[in-house]
Amino acid sequence: MSTPTKAVLHLPSAHFIVWETSLPTSEVLARLDFALNKDGATEFMSHVHRDMKTQQELVDGIHSVVNGRAGLVFFSTIPLHKLTTFRTGNPNPPHIAVYSFGNPLYAQRVIKHNPIAAANIPPRMVIIENENRDGTRIGYNLPSSIMMDPFGKEDEELKADLLSLDKKIEAMVLGIIRA
């Protein structure tokens, strides 16, 4: 019989980024769907697991889905605002959606250097309609603050990949709220 052990890893402090815009949530969601190629990427991950056999097939598949957009791929969305309807009885609560997105090529590189980071892959983003519906908040954990090696091992390649991912996500968000 094995004896389980538990370790509490003190990660560097996570940085949660929140952007605010006066854009309607429906517009933010439409732009995010476009940036992540939601229509083209919806079946992508099942195709990865079911049909792809080589790294080159994965690379080609990602490039075909990304197709010059944000460099990130849509995976899923969870409409959490619907849960508040049950609790409040409000049939039309402010919109809250959590998006999962990413790029499997980034994921491969990050996991190579820090397998524990897989707990935070794919990245997630929350889109929240303001209570008075006069704008939208977009929030996400900064990848470089939650995916570095928790044992303190500095890896320059991992750090560079995560800082690049930070910039890629920020550029996507700014493209959405400034467009």
Residue spans for each PLM region:
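Feature detects long, helix-prone N-terminal segments enriched in hydrophobes
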Residues: 2-179
